[in-house]
């Protein structure tokens, strides 16, 4: 590693602090605290693909009712937007932690999830391709800005990054790489353009 373990921890904190400030400003988001566990049967936990097993256990203080560790905040975020009274143009973000016991692990994936999660209220008129593209560009700008600041603080991590985004559809990828899997197509187009946003996934 280019950094020591201690430097790595400092860098992680710096990146997380800076990126959340930049992203929240770009997308008009408030930080909220998300649950790690929810009551089983509440309908809040997301089933993902419907086959992943949830981590569950009983809680003595609520008559041994079963609780589950969250796998995704997709349903909870929408509920939170409603309960907190957010309006069009406003949203929330959270530093999500979860456990996905059946995930395939690699250098990018772990059974322990630590990721940014966000949701925003939009109008019916904003449900279009142009608004999606502008949102993606705003996120990329936040990432690039963070990367530049990190490079200044940690020159050993410096490498060029620009704000250009190439938009492609799943059908275009299938036409271009007919003999590849969906994951292989994503990797190939990312290598070709540096970064891309795939649309019309399903």
Where are these predicted regions, by residue range?
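Short, flexible, solvent-exposed loop/turn segments with mixed acidic/basic and small polar residues
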Residues: 106-111, 185-188
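Long, highly charged amphipathic alpha-helices
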Residues: 14, 18, 134-145
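Glycine-rich, often proline-containing surface loops adjacent to acidic residues and nearby aromatics
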Residues: 111-121, 193-194
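Short, structured patches in soluble enzyme cores that scaffold and shape functional sites
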Residues: 120-124, 200
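Class II aminoacyl-tRNA synthetase-like tRNA-binding/catalytic domains
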Residues: 1-109, 117-119
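Residues that form generic nucleotide/phosphate-binding pockets
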Residues: 22, 135, 176
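Well-ordered alpha/beta subsegment
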Residues: 123-125, 129-133
């Amino acid at each position: 590693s280019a950094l020591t373990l201690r430097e790595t921890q400092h860098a992680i904190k710096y990146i997380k602090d800076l990126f959340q400030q930049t992203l929240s400003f770009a997308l008009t988001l408030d930080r909220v605290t998300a649950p790690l566990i929810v009551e089983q049967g509440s309908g809040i936990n997301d089933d993902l693909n419907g086959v992943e097993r949830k981590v569950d256990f009983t809680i003595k203080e609520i008559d041994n009712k079963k609780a589950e560790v969250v796998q995704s905040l997709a349903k909870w975020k929408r509920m939170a937007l409603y309960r907190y009274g957010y309006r069009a143009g406003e949203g929330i973000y959270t530093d999500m932690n979860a456990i996905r016991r059946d995930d395939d692990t690699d250098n990018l994936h772990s059974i322990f999830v630590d990721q940014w999660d966000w949701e925003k209220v939009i109008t019916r008129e904003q449900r279009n391709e142009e608004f999606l593209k502008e949102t993606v560009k705003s996120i990329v700008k936040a990432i690039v800005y963070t990367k530049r600041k990190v490079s200044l603080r940690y020159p050993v991590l410096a490498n060029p990054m620009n704000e250009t985004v190439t938009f492609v559809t799943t059908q275009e990828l299938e036409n271009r790489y007919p003999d590849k899997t969906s994951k292989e197509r994503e990797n190939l187009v990312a290598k070709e353009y540096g970064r891309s946003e795939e649309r019309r996934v399903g």
